[in-house]
Each structure stands twice: as structure tokens, then as C-alpha cells.
């Protein structure tokens, strides 16, 4: 099992809009059977205006398939695209971390 952590560093004043997008995405992911996603904001972090989303996947192959939208209906794919519209305007940059869950 792998833990995928998406770390986004938002532009000043844009955190709430990105949190709202992330929470909507988490809800859609859970509704479509892709599992639960946690969305967190910084309390004390490396940088201000940080959002972290994390979720678990069974393998890198499963993650790659999920990122490609494999197994999703065109309707669901369009919902994801609509949710993430304009997110580049909210974020300076981001990174992804992948961890193997040991226990």
C-alpha cells in the first residue's frame, strides 16, 4: 500500500479557494469508490499557505491508472476537470510525495 501526498503552495489569499476545490475533489473521489482523501492546511509548516491532500492506493500501477482516469466514465472525468478548472491561478507550485506504508 502506498500513501500519496500532494503538497500545494498557494498564492497569498488563495488558500480557501484551493481548499474548497480539494474538498470537492475528495468528496467526488469517495463517491466514485476511489477511497478517502484527507485535506489539510498548514498550522505550522515549511511555508505559509500550504495545502496537503493525501490518499492511499494499493500500487503505483493503480495510482497511474487513477491519474489517467482509467475505469472512469466520461461524465466523472468531466466532473474532475470542472472541479480543477483554474487551479493554476491559485497555486505557486507543488510537489508529490509517495510513501510505502509499512504498518
Predicted regions and their residues:
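Absolute protein N-terminus
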Residues: 1-2, 103
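Residue-level preference for beta-strand/loop junctions
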Residues: 2, 47-49
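Active-site-flanking beta-strand signature of metal-NTP-handling nucleotidyl enzymes
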Residues: 3-8
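Short hydrophobic/aromatic beta-strand micro-patches
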Residues: 9, 54-56
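Short, surface-exposed ligand-recognition loops at beta-strand->loop->(often short) alpha-helix junctions
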Residues: 9-20
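An amphipathic, aromatic/His-enriched active-site/gating alpha helix that lines ligand/cofactor pockets
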Residues: 20-38, 56-95
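A short beta-turn/loop motif at secondary-structure boundaries
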Residues: 41-47, 87
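Long, low-complexity, Ser/Thr/Gly/Pro-rich intrinsically disordered segments that act as flexible linkers
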Residues: 94-102
Amino acid at each position: 500500500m502506498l500513501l500519496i501526498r500532494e503538497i500545494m503552495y498557494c498564492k497569498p489569499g488563495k488558500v480557501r479557494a484551493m481548499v474548497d476545490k480539494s474538498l470537492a475533489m475528495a468528496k467526488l473521489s469517495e463517491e466514485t469508490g476511489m477511497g478517502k482523501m484527507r485535506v489539510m492546511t498548514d498550522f505550522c509548516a515549511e511555508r505559509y499557505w500550504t495545502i496537503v491532500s493525501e490518499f492511499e492506493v494499493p500500487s503505483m500501477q493503480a495510482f497511474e491508472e487513477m491519474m489517467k482516469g482509467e475505469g472512469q466514465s466520461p461524465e466523472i472525468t468531466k466532473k474532475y476537470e470542472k472541479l480543477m478548472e483554474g487551479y493554476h491561478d491559485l497555486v505557486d507550485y507543488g510537489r508529490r510525495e509517495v510513501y510505502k506504508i509499512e504498518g
